[in-house]
UniProtKB/Swiss-Prot annotation:
Organism for this UniProt entry: Arabidopsis thaliana (Mouse-ear cress)
Localization of this protein: Secreted, Cell wall; Membrane
Annotated CDD domains: DPBB_EXPA_N
Family of this protein: Belongs to the expansin family. Expansin A subfamily.
Membrane topology type: Peripheral membrane protein
Limits of the Expansin-like CBD domain: 171-251
GO CC annotation: extracellular region; membrane
UniProt-listed SMART domains: DPBB_1 (SM00837)
Gene giving rise to this polypeptide: EXPA17
PANTHER family the UniProt entry points to: EXPANSIN-A15 (PTHR31867)
Function: Causes loosening and extension of plant cell walls by disrupting non-covalent bonding between cellulose microfibrils and matrix glucans. No enzymatic activity has been found. Target of the transcriptional activator LBD18. Regulated by LBD18 to promote lateral root formation.
UniProt protein name: Putative expansin-A17
């Protein structure tokens, strides 16, 4: 009797889960996911978005490298995606009912020496997430290697304000903007020194790094950040006038 009851419960749970997948799939998109970086995700540090140490920058191990179709030449850096293993296709590999929200922090390059369905997982036009190993193991089993997934863009939740790290040299301020909440994906950045009343549009250099070619030494710095959804926030005088290249400053502003 106990075995029959347990079987019925399992069948009900499975039915409910598959109904859930079917009901949400219309609003979600299909892709595949693999993993990299090791069990502690140490191999995911750095990357094509320029965030550096993902542990200290607030992203931890819930990250992924995106294929060409999703990376959008770096414009997708900082964006967040909810990912669910598609148990309707590989129930033996999925962890039922589990999903995870990851941040795009890296680029998964194509491998044209291999077929798109046999090793060249990140070849265009395939949408693909190469997830940090701990993130992948939240939704699927290690032995799966690769699984079909459902994904959708979601808002990013961050602790604290946006962070501005200033690199470069005189007349070339290269500013990494990290820990961005809300839509996450930056579309435009402005900078203003305390000796000016005019906001200067910065150009994106690579990943989440934006540059200015103005001499700004000895000035406190303010930034305006616009996301891909059009929302704008200003971090006024977030950088003090005695700043030095290589320093990072955390604002009290976020989306």
């Amino acid at each position: 009797m106990t075995k029959i009851f347990s079987l019925l419960v399992a069948m009900i749970f499975s039915t409910m889960f598959f109904m859930k997948i079917s009901s949400v799939s219309a609003g979600w998109l299909q892709a595949h996911a693999t993993f990299y970086g090791g069990s502690d995700a140490s191999g995911t540090m750095g990357g094509a978005c320029g965030y550096g140490n993902l542990y200290t920058d607030g992203y931890k191990t819930n990250t992924a490298a995106l294929s060409t179709a999703l990376f959008n030449d770096g414009k997708s850096c900082g964006g967040c995606y909810q990912i669910l293993c598609d148990a309707t296709k590989v129930p033996q590999w999925c962890l039922k009912g589990k999903s995870i929200t990851i941040t795009a922090t890296n680029f998964c390059p194509p491998n044209f020496a291999q077929a798109s369905d046999n090793g060249g997982w990140c070849n265009p036009p395939r949408p693909h997430f190469d997830m940090a190993q701990p993130a992948f193991l939240t939704i699927a089993k290690y032995k799966a290697g690769i699984v079909p997934i459902l994904y959708k863009k979601v808002g990013c939740r961050r602790s604290g304000g946006m962070r501005f790290t200033i690199n470069g040299r005189n007349y070339f301020e290269l500013v990494l903007i990290s820990n961005v909440a809300g839509g996450g994906e930056i579309s435009k950045v402005w900078i203003k020194g305390s000796k000016s009343n005019k906001w200067e549009t910065m150009s994106r250099n690579w990943g989440a790094n934006y540059q200015s070619n103005t001499y700004l030494n000895g000035q406190s710095l303010s930034f305006k950040v616009q996301l891909s959804d059009g929302s704008i926030k200003a971090a006024l005088n977030v950088v003090p006038s005695n700043w030095r290249f290589g320093q990072s400053f955390k604002s009290n502003v976020n989306f």
